[in-house]
Amino acid sequence: MSDTESPLTVLKARIALLATAIGGPDYTSQIDPPPYQIGDDCLACLKDLKRWFRLVDDNQRRWDVAMAVAEYKILTDDLLPILIDWENKCYLATKLSKGNSDISAHFKNKQYYDKIALNCLQLMVLMTWPLILTEQSSTNQINLYSELKKHQLTYKKAILSVENGKVLKAAIRIAIDVIKLDRLARTPRDNMVLKMVLNFIRNILAIEPGELTITARKNIASKGINSVDTLPPNVTQDDISQSTVISCFKKNKVFPFLLTLGSSMTKEFDQDFINIPLMEVMFFLTKDISQDSLLFKSGELDTAQSENHLSKAGQELNDLLQKESQLKKKVIMNTSTRHSRFGAMLSIQTLDQKRLTVSGSQNLLDNSKALQKIDDSKKSKGRRPMIRNETDNESLPTNLLNVHKKSGTYLPLTISKYLNDFINDFIDSSFNYLLKSVTNYFVTEEDKIISLEKIEYLLFFAWFNKYQILRCQVDKDADIMMISESIKETTFILVSSLLRSSYDSKAWAVVHSSMLAFNELLKLVNSLKKFEDNEDIEYVLSRLFSDERIQLLSNLPRIASTHSLSFMKTSIELTHTVLKILEMYSGDNSLVVESKRRAKKMKSISKEDYERLVNEEGYDPDEAIEILNPGHKTIVINFKRVQSSFFHRNTIDLYINTLKRFNELEYSHIKMIISFLYRLFVENNEETLFYRLDFIILLKDMLKQDGLPRTSKARTHINDFAKYYLSRLKRKLKSSPAWHVGILFPPLNDGVVGYFQKYGEHKMTKESEIYAVQPSQFIPFEQQEMMSENMILDMQIGVLVSTLIDEGSQNLVELVRENVQHLIAVFTSHLEVAGENEKTPNNEAFILKEEYDVNPLHYNRHIRALLQLVGFEIPILKSDPCFYRGTTEFSRLVKCEESITKYLNIPFETPNGLPSSSYLKQQSEKNNSLESDGWKGNEDYDYTDPNIVPDNEVDDNDYFKDLDKSTNIRKEKRTVGIASKKTQSKNKTSRNRKKASFRLPNAIEGKDKQPQENLEVFSKEYISDSDEDDEEILNPVFFENEMYMRWLLDKYNGQLPNDKFLSFGRFVNERLSNNGKVVSDFTSLFDGPVPPIDALPLEGITRKGPDKTLLTLSRVEINESNQDNENTQVNEQVDETSENLTINKNARNIGISHGHVESEADDDEPITKKRRTSAN
């Protein structure tokens, strides 16, 4: 095929024809320059262009149409003149109509021209849409990326400069025609027009120069390429700068249009169409703009006006001049005259008779520079860790997260004033509405949200929160509650869940933005101390102090040292804020959170009051207990324990690696780093983490002549810390000379060696000081953020009870329940005298009714966790008692007793369908990688942690032996109906499912190991799907229970209330255990007596009755299992090679025809099984 017949050539030719037919300058006119004249087929040509965009660029993942349109300059030569001419005609017609709504009399063929204007705007949105390269991008898109970016910069300049950006007025006029309509009269097409106008404004803001490189390694410097090479001809940075955009928006009334949409979002507009585009407009409008540059204190505005505010180019020149001045000082300091260069060569002979030579007089002044020059001359250099850029693998612009970049967007004073006024008006009128709408959209449409939208939402959230906090400090009339939606429960849950999910999926760009948003949220909560009675603030604070949250926040700085400097700074800021807030509520300043249900003021509390509330006033027992008890919940923060979770070696690496780049840090960041190091080194005496050679060299480099400037305030802090640090180091080297070698290597994690390094003596452990095992830790449930505390407690108890029953320790669960019931009786009796004696009950000890070879209170992880949930103080040492404090909430005790009793009688159903132990962290997960959220139980700084088993009780090879302890059920070659045997490690004894059995865990030695019998365990947990031995399917009671369930579901419109559901579970278990008989009273379940099974109609399903086919099917199965002759007759009628039993899980209309059960109501995928047709 010749070049003239290639598809691309044909495409360009057709685009050229369309460009010609749209219109052009009218050279017959006497006006100079000639006016634009649209063609006769202008509207059809514009529609054809839109079809080409959809057909080629959208469907084929190419940018050929966009490139051809750019080459023929359709936007600048056709679309802009058409829209501006339409705007001028509309303005003139409006002026001539003198306020009348109908201007068609002064504008002929207005509807036709309106359609042309709308199509022009649609094409402009397509042509200015942000270009993003992803892993799915085609070769064509990659090749055209840089050229199209330059063309979009040309579009941006033309839009902003042609007649002072009048095309923006035309776009807003199109939107105003829709706004004039009543909300109920608007069609979805009208709402899409509003969304399109917002997208057009968003596109103008988002167009920026392209990246220097588009490879995965974006941090590679491109030699010979600068920012000018990414700009097209005749376009400068000032033409497309943010200040130019803001000035154009001010002239063309874009800001009032945005305020109109934002302030009336929930009343006058369909918010689902405009919330995301409006958020993106606000994000790009404030991107890379410092909040401080927009705020002026009283008296500073006049000073700022007198100063010469430079443009962006001027500010960049000023920065370059400062760098040049610093370089000159270094050159003068290290340069000498030519006469002093003689005798300035140094030569060192090595052991292998080789020589290392350096020359230069500066090497005589500084030994470190001489050694550095020798290292630089080596051919092979050490492996350098690669610094990860968060946006590399997520197809995001590299400048998306430059929140800490010094050279941000510079705005002249007048432009700053324009933007400042608009931002203030937006916060006061629209911010809460917009944030609430976008948050609800993200919660409901979570699966549809892409990473870029998540980042935009989080950065939008962080920027406006920080701005309003600073604004309230400057302007006393500003109200911090104008951003009250930021502390709502839904917003906090969304920000927290984005942080958690992005950390788990290693989406580091979202993690970075989530840390920024969470940090600003905490600062906002901290600034709202005077509103501590606010329930939203109480909710945020109560959830902040959960163990899962602290684990996540302490893990973030551990992985930050391998990321960009901006990521490291954000992690340090977040850690600083978290520790500041936690310390505020530690010690005597306990956090008091009011419960959801207010406490009633009563003069005296007695058993009669409790019975009156339950029997006479109809309160539930839980509600009565909460009314009788104080309505406040006190959260006591163990700040020392929480703080220790941040004291990890990798966290120290983060702070030291960040401090190594002190020339790029601001004073505030250096102060945060020194504050953390002081907290760790001085206040907590964790010296061993700092005795390292690189840290000593870092302090020396910072205090050198070319280190921190002598005028810097941070130099004083560094100097004071260095003096104290060196004095402690000298003392440690004298008392423990082994540290002369120790500073060259990382500290050891071994408990014995680490203890000796830290204290200089061997660790002696007495029998009475042996620690008990660590309680089981939970893996968060699905959507745990949305659950209440009572629901989480109930599910955690269900997990532990079910796991203990599976392990054969049901007797221990019953023992816990007996103790809890005894406590309830003690507390109830105490209520009788509470009115006269306000003393709290005495502490009650846990009672073991029988002797155990090994105390389960010390060595059963699940029992210890269960006792901890109930409220017991579990023993840490062997000599410690286990008791229940009298000050603990009585309502929690009652709830725990009910949950334990419930799950002893009803099996616990896990949300994920796996065994309940899947929600418990295994022992081998305690010391997993840094990416996990678990506490580091054997960290080098925490040798006295009571949760750690002493080293004299653990074999040195236990770490390697633990690798073989996982017992996975083998799926292949499984015998039907017989469970495969679980493999046991040599140190781990078997667990027989007997009530009196309890074995010593592998952390304890010296006990005889009992042999494991080779038994074949018959368990339905491991039976493969087969109907040959499926007794449940053959049991008629099973089908009858199904009939009752469907009858109840139909009665309650497909959803049973929670109390009915629990009652039905007891009803089902009782019928299965009693072969269909019912002994208990289930009147509340059926709102009357239990209907007999025969009383239910036998015909097919109707909307008012359950399906009776299951009853017929159960009777058929009984006959098949009991009568061989009838089975033979059935086999003669049914072809066993083609007969299938199809049961639809959700079907309501089921009929039997020729041995088949087929669904007629639902379209779900059926579960098909072969029906047994042969006699037993």
From Swiss-Prot:
One GO location term (cellular component): cytosol
The keyword Protein transport belongs to this UniProt entry's keyword annotation: no
Top-level taxonomy: Eukaryota, Fungi, Dikarya, Ascomycota, Saccharomycotina
GO biological process: DNA repair; DNA replication checkpoint signaling; maintenance of DNA repeat elements; meiotic cell cycle; mitotic sister chromatid cohesion; replication fork arrest; replication fork processing
Quaternary structure and interacting proteins, as annotated: Component of the fork protection complex (FPC) consisting of TOF1 and CSM3.
InterPro entries the record matches: Timeless, Timeless_N
Protein name (Swiss-Prot/TrEMBL): Topoisomerase 1-associated factor 1
Keyword DNA repair: yes
Region (Disordered): 375-394, 915-949, 974-998, 1148-1176
UniProt KW keywords: Cell cycle, DNA damage, DNA repair, DNA replication inhibitor, Meiosis, Nucleus
Biased composition (Polar residues): 915-931
Basic residues: compositionally biased ranges: 983-997
Coiled coil: none
Family named by the database record: Belongs to the timeless family.
Pfam families: TIMELESS (PF04821)
Function: Forms a fork protection complex (FPC) with CSM3 and which is required for chromosome segregation during meiosis and DNA damage repair. FPC coordinates leading and lagging strand synthesis and moves with the replication fork. FPC stabilizes replication forks in a configuration that is recognized by replication checkpoint sensors.
Superkingdom: Eukaryota
GO terms assigned for molecular function: DNA binding
Entry's localization field: Nucleus
PANTHER family noted in UniProt: PROTEIN TIMELESS HOMOLOG, TIMEOUT/TIMELESS-2
